């Protein structure tokens, strides 16, 4: 632990760079997925603005727009065949995924999708919401539930990585997740233009040059 705490800041920046690069080159080949990530990123930035003003509204934006567009890109548009750029199978990429791979995302998204139904039949969400929150209305309650699901998902996987990998990997991954919206805007702002040209798959020439 002492070694982790005394590691130079450049060590964490390099680990962050590697995680971001691997995430891009392995899991973001589809231009539609990239464009949806751009929409997601811009929506996340808006949700960040409301985070300390109205957490419920922030979560409604984050889950209702950002996560929906982001995950639909992964589930429906990202190729699942053999990755010739990285010379890796889909199964291998799923196994080495640091964050939430598709299997883990199914669990997280199931919790998200189940929350509105549970709240409809139990306005206090099985006793977890106090009366003041319930009086705020359905959307206010739903936003707070989604807020805690999001925070819980981030903390759970971060701590999980402490044991699966190491503390540095977990902390860097958490930082990556929180700053991804800003990075994705810089990375994918050209993707809609590529789509308009009819380019459905990023040729990933920049990734192939690293092999």
Give the label of every model feature segment.
Residues 139-156:
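An amphipathic alpha-helical core segment
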Residues 2-24, 75-99, 159-211:
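Membrane-proximal soluble regions of multi-pass membrane proteins
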Residues 17-48, 94-110:
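Membrane interfacial helix-start motif at the N-side
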Residues 53-78, 151-164:
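Hydrophobic alpha-helical membrane-embedded segments
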